[in-house]
């Protein structure tokens, strides 16, 4: 589902977004959160493992409303990020990002060339199963994908100024 990321706009405009973590698989929960006015939810796939089909169903539930689905992946690996985004998530949150290098890698994994190294497959759900011009889709996806490096350790706090120098790794 091609959908503009309203959460990125709220952040860019300095606004306040309301969201929550979701730790179980029921697409109606995603739908209800959107209906009652939440701006986003983070599908926690780090602490609660669900298969890709379940993740897609949760994102489909979100797509019935205006809520932004973000997937917290298990680890900072290109395939983890790729599968979440190809499933239709409008962003990824990656745990335990401690260094500038890790944050930069994450940003590259989440964006298509020229901004990153994300693998391109036009036939996936996020690309509307190939029904959108590929150049338009790549531009749209790069502009609308939210990338969140989750700072959870003392090491990250010590490196935060350096991590924040790469704006692509934050938003």
Locations of regions flagged by a protein language model:
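Alpha-helix-loop-beta-strand connector modules within alpha/beta enzyme cores
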Residues: 52-86, 110-116, 140-142
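Conserved anion-binding
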Residues: 79, 91-167
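Active-site mouth loops of central-metabolism enzymes
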Residues: 11-27, 69-74, 145-162
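Conserved small/polar residues in nucleotide/adenosyl-binding loops
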Residues: 170-171
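N-terminal amphipathic alpha-helix/helix-capping segment at the start of soluble metabolic enzymes
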Residues: 1-19, 132-144
């Amino acid at each position: 589902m091609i959908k503009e990321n309203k959460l990125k706009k709220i952040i860019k405009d300095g606004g306040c977004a309301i969201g929550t973590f979701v730790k179980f698989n029921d697409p109606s929960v995603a739908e209800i959160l959107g209906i009652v006015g939440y701006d986003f939810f983070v599908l926690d796939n780090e602490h609660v493992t669900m298969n890709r089909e379940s993740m897609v169903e949760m994102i489909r539930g979100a797509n019935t409303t205006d809520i932004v689905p973000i997937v917290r992946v298990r680890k900072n690996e290109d395939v983890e990020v790729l599968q979440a985004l190809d499933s239709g998530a409008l962003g990824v949150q990656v745990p335990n990002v401690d260094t500038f290098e890790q944050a930069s890698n994450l940003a590259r994994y989440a964006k298509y060339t020229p901004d990153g190294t994300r693998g391109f497959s036009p036939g996936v759900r996020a690309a509307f199963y190939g029904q959108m011009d590929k150049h338009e889709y790549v531009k749209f996806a790069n502009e609308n994908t939210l990338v969140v490096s989750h700072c959870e350790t003392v090491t990250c706090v010590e490196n935060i100024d350096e991590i924040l120098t790469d704006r692509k790794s934050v938003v």
